[in-house]
């Protein structure tokens, strides 16, 4: 069993895919979950807790979350809703500070397609620009993006055009990540994350 440690930050279905992949890669996993989105289990949690905004405006990060980030070998952001699953975690001051100082490899997993109402029309470049604008101290060591057949279904454009990563200082890791249900395949994502953790080139 691996003794490596990972932290996954996000919420909703995207975080569930990451959490399904990570046990194949590391021996210890901490999930830092936002409930700011409006769907799935995190949305139900938010409704049950009657939470509509962050109070206080500058919340204090839990020591457990900060400690997990400090001890991590791998930190994974996404996939998931950019503004309601990924960014809320980064805006908590203690989390942002811990991420900036982390010794771990920090990875952003891009979505497979656009999201109506929140990210429609946003390219992968737009996602990375938004991360930089909202979390300027964040250091990304790698961006993981799907390269292969486009997701079927609702006809929304994909967000993972490899051309969006040309010229970026962050390492681009392209792989076929699509499962049979138009989501990220945990086994494929695990292989990519294991390669990043092990320092394998792309």
Regions found by a protein language model. Name each.
Residues 89-96, 122-127:
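Charged helix-capping and loop-helix junction motifs
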Residues 1-6, 20-23, 56, 60, ...:
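Non-transmembrane, aqueous-exposed alpha-helical and coiled segments at domain scale
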Residues 51-79:
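Active-site gating loop/helix substructures
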Residues 30-36, 105-112, 141-148:
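Short internal beta-strands
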Residues 28, 34-53, 192-199:
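Electropositive, gly/pro-rich neighborhoods at or near active sites that engage anionic ligands
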Residues 80-92, 153-157:
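Glycine/threonine-rich flexible loop motifs
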Residues 121-202:
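C-terminal functional extensions of proteins
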Residues 27, 102-106, 170:
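A short helix->loop->beta-strand "cap" motif at the edges of active sites that frequently abuts
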């Amino acid at each position: 069993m691996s003794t490596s440690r990972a932290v996954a930050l996000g919420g909703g279905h995207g975080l569930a895919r990451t959490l399904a992949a990570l046990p194949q890669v590391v021996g210890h996993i901490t999930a830092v979950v936002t409930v700011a989105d409006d769907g799935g289990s995190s949305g139900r949690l938010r409704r049950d807790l009657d939470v509509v905004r962050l109070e206080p405006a500058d919340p204090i990060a839990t020591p457990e979350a900060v400690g997990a980030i400090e001890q991590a070998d791998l930190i994974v952001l996404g996939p998931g809703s950019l503004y309601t699953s990924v960014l809320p975690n980064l805006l908590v001051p203690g989390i942002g500070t811990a991420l900036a100082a982390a010794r771990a490899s920090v990875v952003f997993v891009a979505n497979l397609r656009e999201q109506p109402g929140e990210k429609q029309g946003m390219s992968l470049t737009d996602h990375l620009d938004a991360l930089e604008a909202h979390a300027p101290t964040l250091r990304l060591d790698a961006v993981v993006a799907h390269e292969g057949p486009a997701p079927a279904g609702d006809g929304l454009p994909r967000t993972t055009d490899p051309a969006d990563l040309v010229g970026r200082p962050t390492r681009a890791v392209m792989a076929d990540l699509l499962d049979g249900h138009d989501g990220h395949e945990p086994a494929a994502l695990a292989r990519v994350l294991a390669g990043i953790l092990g320092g394998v080139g792309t």
